[in-house]
């Protein structure tokens, strides 16, 4: 019974956290939402994957055919999760290599590259030297000077806060645990909100206008690659409404501590589940192969 509770805990945690995720995310300042959602997703994914492997090793040691068959199913699920994660990682690597083509173009001293393209778009290309902000003439020609500056500040915020890393961490976590798929939208919206607030430091009204105009112009533009951060077009209304209101309050410590506690508990579960795997596959000297926690 203790083993069942131990191995099912991360899946129950994933279900509860996913159910309450929008409400929980709202308790964090935009600057905190992205890293908190990302690292919680990674922690849940690792914990749930380790529980799959532990469950497989426990069931494989059963004498009944049903137990061994169930163990095989869990093993296949764990292997499939790894394959999906590796496949996504390869897609990300391909996208990163494709983005290097932008770095070969000339740019101004501010790290902004304007492409002669009628399709309106703006995105950030990460790089070791601080990255690159790419705009198309289709977008810049439709914006005022202040709105262009707001869009550039927005994209720079993505680079500064390394949102691409956090977004892809959640994407990988969702490949390992499909219950985390809704987290991908949440982290992308959080990244946009964080960048919006950074751009709004000069003028919230101008930032709201830039977001609304850019969202309207770019609504039909297909994201260029898997690393694109932009959320759903429907998120633009939420972002504009947030920018037309007061700036977010300072982050409360209790929410951060609560998130840290959840991550700590799940990390402990991963350790204990790993101990179950070790007990079954390579029991210590003097320890019965059947020994399991509890």
Region annotations inferred by a language model:
Residues 29-43:
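Loop-to-helix transition at the N-terminal end of transmembrane alpha-helices
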Residues 2-3, 70-95, 216-294:
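Cytosolic-facing loops and C-terminal tails of multi-pass membrane proteins
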Residues 6-26:
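N-terminal signal-anchor/start-transfer transmembrane helix
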Residues 41-45, 49, 169:
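Hydrophobic alpha-helical transmembrane segments of multipass membrane transporters and ion channels
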Residues 46-104:
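Transmembrane alpha-helices and immediately adjacent membrane-cytoplasm interface residues
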Residues 2-7, 49:
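Alpha-helical transmembrane segments of integral membrane proteins, especially early/N-terminal helices
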Residues 22-27, 81-167, 179-250:
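Polar-ligand-bearing catalytic/cofactor-coordination segments
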């Amino acid at each position: 019974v203790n083993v069942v509770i131990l191995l099912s805990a991360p899946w129950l945690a994933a279900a509860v956290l996913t159910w309450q995720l929008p409400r929980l995310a709202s308790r964090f300042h935009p600057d905190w939402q992205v890293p908190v959602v990302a690292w919680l997703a990674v922690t849940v994914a690792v914990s749930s994957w380790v529980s799959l492997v532990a469950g497989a090793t426990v069931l494989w040691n059963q004498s009944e055919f049903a137990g061994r068959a169930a163990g095989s199913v869990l093993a296949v699920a764990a292997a499939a999760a790894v394959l999906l994660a590796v496949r996504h990682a390869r897609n990300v690597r391909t996208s990163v290599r494709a983005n290097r083509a932008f770095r070969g173009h000339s740019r101004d001293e501010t790290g902004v590259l304007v492409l002669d393209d009628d399709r309106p778009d703006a995105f950030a290309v990460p790089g070791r030297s601080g990255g690159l902000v790419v705009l198309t003439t289709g977008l810049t020609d439709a914006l005022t000077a202040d709105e262009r500056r707001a869009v550039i500040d927005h994209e720079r915020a993505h680079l500064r806060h390394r949102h691409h890393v956090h977004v892809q961490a959640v994407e990988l976590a969702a490949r390992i645990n499909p219950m985390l798929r809704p987290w991908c939208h949440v982290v992308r919206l959080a990244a946009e909100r964080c960048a919006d607030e950074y751009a709004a430091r000069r003028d919230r009204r101008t930032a709201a206008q830039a977001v609304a105009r850019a969202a309207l112009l770019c609504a039909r533009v297909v994201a260029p690659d898997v690393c694109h951060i932009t959320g759903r077009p429907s998120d633009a209304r939420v972002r504009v409404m947030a920018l037309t209101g007061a700036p977010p309050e300072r982050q409360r410590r209790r929410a951060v501590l609560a998130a840290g506690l959840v991550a700590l508990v799940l990390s402990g579960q991963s350790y204990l589940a790993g101990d179950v795997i070790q007990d079954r596959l390579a029991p210590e000297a003097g320890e019965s192969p059947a020994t399991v926690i509890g």
